[in-house]
A protein has these predicted regions:
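Alpha-helical transmembrane bundle of multi-pass membrane proteins
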Residues: 6-258
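AAA+ P-loop ATPase catalytic core
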Residues: 2
Length: 258
């Protein structure tokens, strides 16, 4: 099987120099559209907030009402375990069972619901994360626990949706002749946005008076980008599960709205 695949790749790329690959990537409309899809997937996924939640999980749990260093580390560890189990289950079972596009839409929906809830909670307690001396009222304790639970829900949604699809789409969409170049570009954009998001979020969480957009504004921003991503996926991403390379080429020969 490996030898057959290698032979097919060698045959597909035979006689294609660097300039030929670049021209085929950017001058063939169906290939350029695939580049657009993978680039948008990388941008929308990284700025949906899930990556920064993982990076800054202890601080964000404290922001939502977790008190104490040990408690913060514990809920962060549980979050990591949930994301690991969800990623394995989604990658090995759910994505192929329910289809790429449906999995992506369900995951984005879960993530959007989570972000909207967290943003709404932070809006109801605007001093959270802004005033260091602020104490969460007793009547907001239940809402705080709900926001913490929504972090876990967003982790599952991320594993089912963007986390799986941003890599699968990049690997599956392109013909063999241009796959190496296009995958390299997509992954470069992926890590550039991941780095940019990780650097931006601490500044976004700052109070408006010090140049940030507040915690509530940060999560409303994540919610908006996640919802925009869901709408974009609905109209732009085709179902690619079970398609051969030949049928993939025929799929992208159609107009985008089909």
């Amino acid at each position: 099987m490996i030898q057959t695949t290698h032979a097919a790749e060698m045959e597909a790329t035979m006689g294609s120099g660097a300039m030929g690959v670049i021209k085929e990537t950017f001058l063939v409309p169906s290939n350029l559209y695939r580049v657009y899809l993978t680039f948008m997937a990388q941008i929308l996924s990284q700025w949906s907030g899930a990556g920064s939640i993982t990076v800054y999980a202890p601080d964000l749990f404290k922001l939502l009402g977790v008190t104490g260093e040990n408690e913060s580390l514990l809920v962060t560890a549980v979050f990591g375990i949930i994301k690991l189990i969800a990623a394995i289950l989604c990658a090995l079972f759910l994505v192929d069972v329910i289809g790429r596009k449906r999995a992506l839409l369900i995951g984005i929906t879960l993530q959007a619901i989570s972000m909207v809830y967290i943003a709404g909670f932070l809006t109801s307690v605007p001093a959270m994360g802004v005033d260091e001396n602020y104490t969460l009222p007793a009547d907001k304790k239940g809402a705080s626990e709900g926001a913490i639970a929504m972090i876990y829900v967003s982790g599952f949604g991320w594993a089912l949706g963007w986390n799986s699809m941003q890599y699968l789409l990049t690997a599956e969409l392109f013909p063999l002749r241009i796959r190496a170049l296009c995958t390299s570009m997509a992954m470069t954009l992926h890590f550039a946005n991941q780095y940019g998001n990780a650097r931006a979020v601490p500044n976004m969480l700052l109070p408006v008076a010090t140049g940030g957009i507040d915690p509530k504004g940060t999560f409303w921003c994540f919610a908006a980008i996640t919802i925009i991503g869901g709408v974009w996926v609905w109209f732009s991403i085709p179902e690619t599960a079970g398609r051969s390379l030949e049928s993939m080429d025929r799929l992208f020969a159609l107009p985008w709205y089909k």
